[in-house]
Structures are given as structure tokens and as C-alpha cells.
Amino acid sequence: MELRAQDLWKYYGERAVVQGVTLHLQPGEILGLLGPNGAGKTTTFGMLYGGVIPSRGLVQVGPYNVHRQGRQVRRILGVVTQENNLDPDFTVLENLVFFAHHYKITGRTAQRRAWELLDQAGLTAYAHQRVDVLSGGLKRRLVLARALVHHPKIVFLDEPTTGLDPDARQEFWRSIATLKQSGCSVLLTTHYMDEAQRLSDRLLLLQKGVVVDQGAPADLIRRIIGAEVAEIEGVDQEVVQRLAEAAGVWWRPLGQGFVVSLPDHDAPLWQALQALPSTRLSRRQANLEDVFLRLTGQELAD
């Protein structure tokens, strides 16, 4: 199932928080919206699944207009927002069974589907316990299971691993990979570089509500930065700038020092950096943080 958005804008008062976003989610694809907090990811996310009305623009899921044919669209979409919104008065199993009722899935069919999802999520042992006994990671897996109760074709995940510890994040990533293998399309918002790079087939980079670039993660890194960068501290900016400009490469201040892209023929530049009286010098693979820093001048953590 395809999703297309054309020229989405959202104003709050006179302030435009999303400006002209156009995207295409292809069948079976994971499309990531990557940007810092405040970039407009969640607002864009809301407009795409119908939770936020755009000031201008069109969102189409298959043959349906998201904001005019909401009933048909809701049967196709599964949504995981940043809030868990689980019912604390119900058990883990009951949360799934009663949520299934929203989609007219009842009786034995609802029970069977709930148990199937609990098994897929590794939550069978918790079926008859209340949700407040679950860890943060288990709650997120339950929320994802709940979003799948009606066999959606497209699943929306808004910052799905925020607040989770590293082990819980890894476990949730495996759930998303399984979801893709089942044939679902996934739209993911995140401000975690590693999450975006690992999960997404394609990325849209958002800054202040504007798409600043897009493409496959590896292609973005290779095209905008190159294979490697150097990080250096303890030298004057003028020295780094002079060396980078002489080599025709990108550089920026980063933390207490500077980051400099290393071209494929980097031996002279790397040797020149090594010759400087720096307090720290290292080289590493380029990543999406570098891409975002070059495109916007801002770190993803900002």
C-alpha cells in the first residue's frame, strides 16, 4: 500500500512549523523522518495519518484521501504515538482484545488475534498481568502489538524508542524488522542517528519543518560527506580552515574541536592533520550526524 503526501504545510498562528513537505512511502518500505527535536517530525507524522489537519496540502493512502475518508483509512493504518496510552485497568491481553473491538473484531476472533500478537511480541507470559508491571520496553512492544491488531498495511511509529535503555531499543528494532518482513510499509520518526541508519530504507532529513535532503542512508553519507572524517581538538580554527580549504573538503566546529571530511585520496590531508600539535586527533566512518551538521549547521542532539 502506497502513501503520498503533496506540499504539506501547517501553521500555528502565523508560524509555519511544516513547510511544503512532499513524500512517497512505497509498499514494503521503511521511510524515516530524521531531525532534531522541534524539526516538525511529529506534526508531519500527525498530518500523514490524519491526526493533524494540514493548513495546506494532500495526503493519499492508496485510493483514499486521509482527511476526507478517515473511516476507510483507519482500517489500513496502524499508529504508535510517543505516548503508550495503555489502559491501566486492563490486563495485557485485555488491552489487545478491547482495542480489537474498535475494528469490529470481537469474540473468539479477537481472542485468537490477541494471543497471536502476544506470541509475536514475546509477551505471552504477561498476558494476565496488568500493564503497570511491564518495563518501558515491554510496554512499547505491547503498544506496537496493539497497533497491528487489525492487520494494517502501513504502520506509523513516532519516536518509538525514546526513553528506552539500549537493550530495549535493540529488541524493538528487531520487532520493526519483523514487521517489514511481513510486508508492511513503515513510516518512522526519530532523532536517533543510529536508529535511522539501521532501520530506514530511505530518509527525509527535516530541519525547521523543511525537507533539506533525502535518500538512502548510505547514499546520503557518501554523497554529502564521503567515507571518513577526522575529529581534531586543541588547534586554532584558522589552521583547520586553511587545511580543509586547500584540500577542497568540508569542515565544521564540533564540540570542543572540529570535524573534517577525509576524501578518498586523503593521505596528504591526514598527514597534515597528524603534524599539528593537537590535543586529540582521530578518524572514523562518516555518519548521519555529519550529514545533518553539514546540511544545517546543527547537530541532531541540538
What are these regions (language model features)?
Residues 97, 101, 108-126:
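Conserved ABC ATPase "signature" region
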Residues 130-137:
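Conserved ABC ATPase signature
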Residues 57-68, 72-73:
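Conserved ABC transporter NBD signature motif
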